[in-house]
Amino acid sequence: MLRRLVISIMLGMVSALIVWLFHQAMLGLEWLLFSRTDGSLVAAAASITGWRRALTPALGGLAAGLLLWAYQRYQHRKPSAPTDYMEAIEIGDGRLDVSASLVKSLASLLVVSSGSAIGREGAMVLLAALFASVFAQRYAKPKEWKLWVACGAAAGMASAYHAPLAGSLFIAEILFGTLMLASLGPVVIAAVSALLTTNLLQGGQETLYQVQTLPSPWPVQYFLMALLGLMAGFSGPLFLKAMAASSHAFRSLNLLPPLQLALGGIIVGLLSLIFPEVWGNGYSVVQSLLTTPPGVLLIGGILICKLLAVLASSGSGAPGGVFTPTLFVGAALGMLCGQIFSLWPVLGDNIGLLMALTGMATLLAATTHAPIMAALMVCEMTGEYTLLPGLLLSCVIATTIARWLRPISVYRSH
């Protein structure tokens, strides 16, 4: 028992350090590319000329594609293990291919730092899980390998999103398939250790998103949250179907990986000429929506262009996650509904923010089929725990409908 406690804490601390180092590497590339280190790719896009804005994501995609293509071409052996930590936990034995995972993470660093509309957290979690896998193979029994990889993945997610409980439930709901208490203990300890280490590295304790404090929802607001869950239940499968169609369309072109990723990048670059907000994973745009939401038409325009950029990035094979982009799409859809609902003052002056947070949780639940994780994650990322009952209700509704329409989640389809 003591041994597991010590290992869990150690994995949490190292995972947080890995996430922090990856973020520092992103800031370094941002300084090289844009001479700025504020971490906002949207601000970087707005500060450069149009031709650079159009070409930078394409060049990043080309560089990442060349790296992946060269590795595949000159690697004279088949991968000894997967590079997907979910596969390693669910159907594997906990082993990850070290060299392939490192190359994939480096390629992800290149595309996310150059503006592709893909999540950076995927590589962060992969690297944390990779360290846990290497450690487990050296110091743990084979039957424990999957547990320690799960701890690394949960810790990486907790550090990236400042959400230790949601990171733990992510593993429990999606990978273990149930809340297995015997396995959940070390996972929670690793996740909490990761968050504490992250707070030390960042010099403070803050939620990922800063929002105004919301009161407990009224009965009519509970109804609207449930209604948004219903909408997300239909929107989630459509989003996944669109990503699958985009991937099929890119594959049908039969391009070499460098050219395919460059094509995805140029699409993102051209869309950024209309709205610079399409650059990056969507974090800064979500923060802006939650604090100073624009009008309905502007939100709709950004949403359409950002959605196309996400489809181009993921469809072209850009290595990265779709977790944060999904949060953006959900926030934008929710804010659109909230802006419309705000025409009726009786619904409250905070209805826009409430709907945006509900949209984030429900679309995440509809795509991951993990309602408890999605509801708790939004609460942890914002500190708005008074919304938890309503978010749980709406997320369960969203997940139920999404499962009925499309039994395969975003992680099963990848």
Curated annotation (Swiss-Prot):
It is a multi-pass membrane protein. Its main location: membrane. The chain crosses the membrane at residues 5-25, 54-74, 116-136, 147-167, 169-189, 220-240, 255-275, 292-312, 327-347, 353-373, 381-401. One of its GO terms (biological process) is response to acidic pH. GO terms for molecular function: voltage-gated chloride channel activity. The keyword Transport applies. Changing T213A: In strain: 487/90. It is found in: Cell inner membrane. The keyword Transport applies. SUPFAM superfamilies: Clc chloride channel (SSF81340). GO terms for cellular component: chloride channel complex; plasma membrane. Belongs to the chloride channel (TC 2.A.49) family. ClcB subfamily. HAMAP family: CLC_ClcB. This is Voltage-gated ClC-type chloride channel ClcB.
